[in-house]
Amino acid sequence: MADQTPTHYAKKETIVVTRILDAPVERVWRSWTDPDLVKKWWGPKYYSSPFCSVDLHEGGKYIFCMRAPKEQGGQDMYTSGVYTKIVPMERLEFTQGMSDKEGNRIDPASIGLPPDFPKELHTVIVFKKIKHDMTELIITESEWTPGQMYIYSIVGMHQCIDKLAEDLKS
């Protein structure tokens, strides 16, 4: 019998998360572009972020790390990508994929993720000023393969933004 493992997925999904944050655009922008601030909220609930680097210019690279809680093994997972478009205080566009700690891309399956986990995502973050001191944040991730990891990623993204919103209160 031939191998039935899918190697190509015709249909791709897009995740869109919109949130109103009680902070001015400038502060929300810094929370996405200042490594020390990213480390305060990156990763889903109970995860921490011990490392982050940001080279904020078009063509610049970023590396974000999220650490699982001890109860889930405590492993570090790295995501890296390249900024493809930057409009300060308005828009960030970048690629995104699993990597090693130096930011070199790795096959997601090599760290235990399912074989259909995307090797590269395209992310757009829009920052819209509403009122004097509030921001509408719109995050769009495209190139997701339908499946369980897609669902987990939606939940994880909401948890990240919950952590960001809480951090912005301080």
Model-derived segments and their meaning:
Residues 16, 36-78, 82:
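Short beta-edge strand/loop motif at the mouth of beta-sheet-based domains
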Residues 87-92:
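Short, conserved beta-turn/loop elements at beta-strand boundaries and strand-helix junctions
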Residues 34-35, 62-66, 105-112:
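Short Pro/Gly-enriched beta-strand edge/turn motifs at strand-loop
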